[in-house]
From Swiss-Prot:
<keyword id="KW-0645">Protease</keyword>
<dbReference type="GO" id="GO:0005768">
    <property type="term" value="C:endosome"/>
</dbReference>
<keyword id="KW-1133">Transmembrane helix</keyword>
<feature type="short sequence motif" description="PAL">
    <location>
        <begin position="328"/>
        <end position="330"/>
    </location>
</feature>
<feature type="transmembrane region" description="Helical">
    <location>
        <begin position="82"/>
        <end position="104"/>
    </location>
</feature>
<feature type="transmembrane region" description="Helical">
    <location>
        <begin position="302"/>
        <end position="322"/>
    </location>
</feature>
<feature type="topological domain" description="Cytoplasmic">
    <location>
        <begin position="279"/>
        <end position="301"/>
    </location>
</feature>
<feature type="topological domain" description="Lumenal">
    <location>
        <begin position="147"/>
        <end position="149"/>
    </location>
</feature>
<keyword id="KW-0378">Hydrolase</keyword>
<feature type="transmembrane region" description="Helical">
    <location>
        <begin position="172"/>
        <end position="192"/>
    </location>
</feature>
<feature type="topological domain" description="Cytoplasmic">
    <location>
        <begin position="28"/>
        <end position="54"/>
    </location>
</feature>
<feature type="transmembrane region" description="Helical">
    <location>
        <begin position="7"/>
        <end position="27"/>
    </location>
</feature>
<dbReference type="InterPro" id="IPR006639">
    <property type="entry name" value="Preselin/SPP"/>
</dbReference>
<feature type="topological domain" description="Cytoplasmic">
    <location>
        <begin position="347"/>
        <end position="372"/>
    </location>
</feature>
<comment type="similarity">
    <text>Belongs to the peptidase A22B family.</text>
</comment>
<feature type="topological domain" description="Cytoplasmic">
    <location>
        <begin position="105"/>
        <end position="123"/>
    </location>
</feature>
<dbReference type="Pfam" id="PF04258">
    <property type="entry name" value="Peptidase_A22B"/>
</dbReference>
């Protein structure tokens, strides 16, 4: 009975909001990836084509991630300002990518004229795109000044969506290879890294705050309003919510005051969801409309992967609440997402096609290896 009462904490605003946000972002990332791939295919524009991982690249991701973890564990204070600057640039680009379709939709709905403004880096920019780019840059500047958790989450979500659109999995075989390797990676760095490095490397890196280069520059130039600029920043590599979401918790006081979920725990499952969403669309050839996904949902693998993600996420949070210790989310998310997809595709005799991926008959597509 005591355990049940403990688990009721998951119904509190912070964990409930985290769960809803993560599930929504994961699905939105997969759906955006599908539309992006179709847009590139329709326009025959492969200059911004996504990267399709092969087996060697999939195996290298956990290795490179481990090296990055150790680098940030030992040298974070030395490279934090550089990381912040790089993250700020990536955030502007990701935010622009995420919001561009909405800007186009609003322009169409309002019947606005949108003349070309200029050309930059072989790309034509319209007036609305220019305004959107300025708005994205101002959002990142606001984050650099305030460090507010809402802006941190906004930038993190945009990075997740952009990553899933531009880094693709060609088939379930490569997907399973990647997920299993990251499954082991997550378990090792959360549960066993303390035995080798004297501290929980994953937790230490996840809770570190970066030095703010804007504060450093303002301080060196003795600019007015220095007290308004936050000295430390949470990098948008995770989404965070105050544990007392409705209680007026001051952002950035302590990492322990926040619930957090790494972007990888959304982006990696979203890559699987993007793969099965593309497979569903290829099999049914439905119109790419988010509301049309409800039709014939019993024939779509996305409706096994997405609930599986939600169940795995709830299980991870429940384990954390019961054990009062950090949990490797992929320990729960990998079986709960990959398992149902493989089992149902085996039952429906689609596993062979999913396992190897679609045959590319178009030579242009083959040369560019465009997969959604």
């Amino acid at each position: 009975m005591e355990t049940l009462w403990t688990l009721l904490y998951l119904l509190e605003p912070a964990p409930a909001t985290l769960i809803v946000t993560a599930v929504t972002v994961t699905f939105a990332s997969a759906f955006r990836a599908l539309n992006y791939g179709k847009e590139m295919e329709r326009n025959r524009d492969f200059s911004e084509a996504s990267i399709t991982l092969d087996s060697s690249q999939a195996l290298m991701i956990p290795v490179m991630s481990s090296c990055s973890l150790l680098l940030m564990f030992y040298l974070f204070s030395s490279v934090s300002q550089l990381l912040t600057a790089f993250t700020a640039i990536a955030s502007v680009s990701s935010l622009f990518y995420w919001l561009s379709p909405y800007a186009v939709y609003m322009k169409t709905q309002l019947g606005l004229s949108d003349p070309f403004l200029s050309r930059c880096c072989s790309k034509s920019f319209t007036r609305i795109q220019g305004l959107l780019l300025v708005a994205c840059a101002m959002t990142v500047v606001a984050w650099l000044i305030s460090g507010h958790w809402v802006l941190n989450n906004l930038l993190g979500i945009s990075i997740c969506i952009a990553f899933v659109s531009h880094v693709r999995l060609p088939n379930i075989k490569i997907c399973a290879m990647l997920l299993v390797c990251l499954f082991v990676y997550d378990i090792f760095w959360v549960f066993f890294s303390e035995r080798f490095f004297g501290a929980n490397v994953m937790v230490a890196v996840a809770t570190q705050q970066a030095s703010n280069p804007v504060h450093t520059v303002a301080n060196s130039l003795n600019l007015p309003g220095l007290q308004l600029i936050t000295k430390k920043l949470e990098l948008p590599v995770k989404i965070v919510f105050p544990r007392n979401l409705l209680g007026g918790v001051v952002p950035g006081v302590s990492a322990s005051d926040f619930m957090m979920l790494g972007l990888g725990d959304m982006a990696i499952p979203a890559m699987l969801l993007a793969l099965v969403l593309c497979f569903d669309h290829r099999k049914t050839r439905d119109v790419v409309n988010i509301f049309d996904l409800k039709s014939s949902k019993g024939h779509k693998y996305i409706w096994y992967a997405l609930p599986g993600y939600a169940i795995g996420l709830v299980a991870a949070l429940a384990a954390g609440v019961l054990t009062h210790s950090p949990q490797p989310a992929l320990l729960y998310l990998v079986p709960s997402t990959l398992g149902p997809v493989i089992f149902m595709s085996w039952r429906r005799k689609d596993l062979a096609e999913l396992w190897e991926g679609p045959a590319l008959s178009n030579p242009i597509e083959k040369s560019h290896e465009i997969e959604i």
